[in-house]
């Protein structure tokens, strides 16, 4: 049911923003996802009202982290549970054009769709996608850079600051760490740098960055694996 659920959410979002591209809609759904999972344990709360007892069903939740429940981290839960209501006003979106996908495919020598432009450089990690992942060699130090560009779809005059969530296995930095937008539709670029000392074989490490202006929280998951 995940596919029709996401398709319905995208159609719902399109009614509010008919001029948005498919990549903008996808970005809005991904970056506003809720990184909480409902508890499998169900508890009941009984309260006495007048002469009757009223039963309340209580569901608990906890953050989606790389724990023994979700030991594969972001690989297991991705961008989280989509929230179509929050996606209506995502604040920022990552837009990806057809030319960006062609460049990405050409960089990995896939050209069944036609002729690749000469001198194409880059790699899949350069695709302006709302998430970031990299395969690194095990037991070796590494540094990976992810260039990204976001578009302000909110009002003018907003300033976003980057917050990094990571663990001791990798270091994540964002430059610049502050983005100020003078107008709606304005674009700003930044680079996310992920580095580490050596990860054992078959290791998956999760992190994330969140751009926040105090109202909007634009979250992008990061995965490094060997």
What kind of region is each of these model predictions?
Residues 1-226:
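Loop-rich non-cytosolic ectodomains and luminal regions
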């Amino acid at each position: 049911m995940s596919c029709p659920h996401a398709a319905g959410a995208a159609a719902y979002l399109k009614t509010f923003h008919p001029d948005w591209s498919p990549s903008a809609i996808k970005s809005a759904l991904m970056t506003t996802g809720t990184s909480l999972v409902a508890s499998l344990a169900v508890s009941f709360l009984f309260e006495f009202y007048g002469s009757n007892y009223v039963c309340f069903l209580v569901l608990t939740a906890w953050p989606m982290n790389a724990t023994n429940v979700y030991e594969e981290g972001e690989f297991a839960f991705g961008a989280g549970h989509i929230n179509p209501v929050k996606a209506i006003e995502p604040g920022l979106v990552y837009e990806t054009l057809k030319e960006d996908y062609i460049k990405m495919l050409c960089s990995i020598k896939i050209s069944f769709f036609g002729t690749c432009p000469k001198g194409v450089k880059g790699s899949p990690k350069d695709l302006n996608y709302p998430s970031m992942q990299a395969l690194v060699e095990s037991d070796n130090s590494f540094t990976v850079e992810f260039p990204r560009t976001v578009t302000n779809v909110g009002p003018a005059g907003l300033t976003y600051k980057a917050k990094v969530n990571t663990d001791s296995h990798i270091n994540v930095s964002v430059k610049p760490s502050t983005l100020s937008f003078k107008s709606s539709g304005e674009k700003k670029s930044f680079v996310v740098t992920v580095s580490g000392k050596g990860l054992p074989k078959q290791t998956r490490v999760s992190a994330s960055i969140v751009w926040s202006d105090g109202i909007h929280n634009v979250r992008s998951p990061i995965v490094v694996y060997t």
